[in-house]
Swiss-Prot record:
GO terms for biological process: nucleotide-excision repair; SOS response. InterPro entries: GIY-YIG_endonuc (IPR000305), GIY-YIG_endonuc_sf (IPR035901), GIY-YIG_UvrC_Cho (IPR047296), Hlx-hairpin-Hlx_DNA-bd_motif (IPR003583), RuvA_2-like (IPR010994), UVR_dom (IPR001943), UVR_dom_sf (IPR036876), UvrABC_protein_C (IPR050066). This is UvrABC system protein C. Gene3D superfamilies: 5' to 3' exonuclease, C-terminal subdomain, GIY-YIG endonuclease, UvrC, RNAse H endonuclease domain. Interacts with UvrB in an incision complex. Its main location: cytoplasm. Residues 14-92 form the GIY-YIG domain. One of its GO terms (molecular function) is DNA binding. The lineage of its organism: Bacteria, Pseudomonadati, Pseudomonadota, Alphaproteobacteria, Rickettsiales. Residues 202-237 form the UVR domain. One of its GO terms (cellular component) is cytoplasm. It holds the Pfam family UVR. NCBIfam families: uvrC (TIGR00194). It is found in: Cytoplasm.
């Protein structure tokens, strides 16, 4: 530890504030808060009492920057803001987990049933779940289709089709798209499906049995048989229903951890509606207690885009409860209480969140260990100095040299890091020259906004000719990163891939080896991202240019449409009334636009 760093700590003020540990090239290593800065920073001078991770960090520290705040609340909020913007290497790292799958029933005039993951859109769907198994969701939807003949097609397909699809032919849909069922009867089926998902199976079954017996007594045996089959399929649906309702706006939190990794789940209620349970993962937790992790998480969670409810339930006591409540008051502009469960209902909801956290953490660790095993083997095969934490994969896409695009995907020890993916629209006109395209992509990547983030390994979709291109770019930019080029076999199919590296003979791997399958999955993901990115770019350019061909649509109206909706995709999803809201668009013209845009998208898809 440098002498000047020690002197800086000794001269720090005995006041409340935030401190930054800064390393080489002004890289922020850690951000912390303290009620007494001098006292807190002096703890770091007790080197032998610190954990190995903190000792390693301190050896990299060149200076400490201090921000004095008026009180602990300001320090808490500033710390959260700096951690979010700077992403220091040694702070607790918070990441979104996978959303649990839900079953949704849309609020369309003829509702659709579907599986859904992601953030809730309460104005568009009713949500049922969560389910811990995607297979359970799929099976439940299938049984609900058979029992109630609900549609699963997209709204776009529903509005444009002229004949029933295969789902109608195999008796899994009542074909409301072509009026094979009345709206009232279809909505009655939807209501019964919703009641089933709410755990009211017995009530629905009695309704179906009553209708079946009525049809039978009227000698309408064909219809009676249909209702008999519905009852049979209904009995196959096993939904463990728990009362996931709460009268007040509230969030329920739970934390489960194993060594350096913690999973925090939150179950949210707003306006008496269940907004679902979402897992988040916190890394670098080894030096922190559960209550410290949860305290940090709460401030970060609500200091971003989430508005705190009036009640927040946590399993145990947390650090600085009163200060956190005051900080959240500043965010919400209303009193916020951090509470413990007092009754059975609250305890049941906390237990549910805890069980979700436990399940999510177990799955995360299984995925992590599987990935780590592959990465250890990969580091040996490709002679890497360390097990890679960040792998970047590059691919290009174009059509006959036009609309050229390059992509970068990122994978780490926890899997694909999709928030790190990047697209590069090729600026120069290279007429499909893959080498020049790759040179531009790599140059922009390592001299652009994220140039400070250096990967541990590069995988290039290319052959021996790409090796010198990559080497030249890295040398010019003074970057030392191991890389390999991966070329497909003779028939350009998966299998018999060849690898090319600087200073090594070309080599191949066994087609069934774990590393080979892993590298193929990386290459395929990069290829998928390149193709879909290119398709979106191409489709957008095509359809926007085609808008001008609609009779009555000139540049002024085209600009008005794109300004109002933002994209052609949004136009295709809009209602007739919404399109009419655009200045200069009449009802007749709105009808033409809607038909045209939906037709063009259908052709492209």
């Amino acid at each position: 530890m440098l002498r000047q760093y020690k002197e800086q700590i000794k001269s720090s003020p005995q006041s409340c504030g935030v401190y930054k540990m800064v390393g080489d090239k002004n890289k922020v290593l850690y951000v912390g808060k303290a009620k007494n800065l001098k006292s807190r920073l002096s703890d770091y001078l007790q080197f032998e009492n610190l954990s190995e991770r903190i000792r390693v960090m301190l050896l990299q520290v060149i200076k400490v920057e201090i921000f004095i705040t008026e009180n602990e609340i300001e320090a808490l909020l500033l710390e959260a803001q700096l951690i979010k913007s700077l992403k220091p290497l040694y702070n607790i790292v918070l990441k979104d987990g996978k959303f649990y799958p839900y079953i949704t029933i849309s609020k369309h005039d003829y509702p659709r049933i579907a599986k859904y993951r992601g953030k809730f859109k309460k104005n568009e769907f009713h949500y049922y779940g969560p389910f811990t198994s995607a297979a359970a969701v799929k099976q439940t939807i299938l049984s609900l289709q058979k029992a109630f003949l609900l549609r699963v097609c997209s709204d776009q397909y529903f509005s444009s089709t002229k004949r029933p699809c295969i789902e109608y032919q195999i008796k899994r849909c009542s074909a409301p798209c072509i009026n094979k069922i009345t709206k009232d009867d279809y909505c009655q089926s939807v209501k019964q499906a919703r009641n089933t998902l709410l755990g009211r199976n017995k009530e629905v079954k009695e309704q179906l049995l009553f209708t079946m017996r009525k049809c039978s007594s009227e000698e309408n045996y064909e219809l009676a048989a249909i209702y008999r089959d519905r009852v049979k399929f209904l009995e196959q649906i096993q939904i463990q229903h728990t009362d996931f309702s709460f009268e007040k706006d509230a969030d329920f939190f739970s934390i489960v951890r194993e060594e350096d990794l913690a999973c925090i789940s939150v179950l949210s209620f707003r306006n008496k509606d269940n907004y679902g349970s979402t897992p988040y993962f916190a890394e670098n937790c080894g030096d922190h207690s559960n209550d410290e992790i949860l305290s940090t998480f709460l401030v970060n969670f609500y200091n971003s885009a989430n508005i705190p409810p009036i009640q927040i339930y946590v399993p145990d006591s947390i650090v600085d409860k009163e200060i956190i409540e005051q900080a959240l008051y500043k965010v919400a502009q209303k009193p916020v209480k951090v509470l413990h469960a007092k009754n059975k209902k609250e305890r049941d909801l906390l237990k549910f969140v805890y069980d979700n956290s436990q399940h999510s953490l177990e799955q995360k660790l299984i995925d992590y260990r599987n990935n780590l095993e592959k990465l250890e083997e990969l580091s040996k095969i490709f002679l890497l100095p360390n097990i890679p934490k960040r792998i970047e994969v590059y691919d290009n896409s174009h059509i006959s040299g036009s609309q050229q695009i390059g992509v970068m995907i990122v994978a780490g020890q926890e899997g694909f890091l999709k928030s790190e993916y990047r697209k590069f629209t090729i600026k120069e006109k290279f007429s499909g020259d893959d080498y020049k395209m790759m040179r531009e992509v790599l140059t922009r990547r390592f001299s652009g906004n994220i140039k400070g983030i250096i990967p541990d390994f590069l995988l290039i979709d290319g052959g021996p000719g790409h090796v010198s291109i990559v080497q030249n770019v890295l040398e010019v930019l003074n970057i030392n990163v191991p890389f390999a080029c991966m070329a497909k076999g003779p028939d350009r199919n998966a299998g018999n891939e060849r690898f090319y590296m600087l200073g090594r003979e070309e080599f191949s791997l066994a087609n069934d080896s774990k590393v080979m399958l892993y590298l193929q999955s990386l290459r395929n993901e990069a290829h998928r991202f390149a193709i879909t990115s290119h398709r979106k770019k191409r489709d957008k350019q095509f359809i926007v240019s085609q808008l001008s061909k609609i009779p009555g649509i000139g540049n002024k109206r085209k600009k008005a449409l794109m300004s109002y909706f933002g994209s052609v995709k949004n136009i295709s999803r809009a209602s007739l009334a919404e399109i009419q809201n655009v200045p200069g668009i009449s009802k007749g013209l709105a009808e033409v636009i809607l038909k045209y845009v939906n037709y063009k998208r259908g052709v492209l898809e």
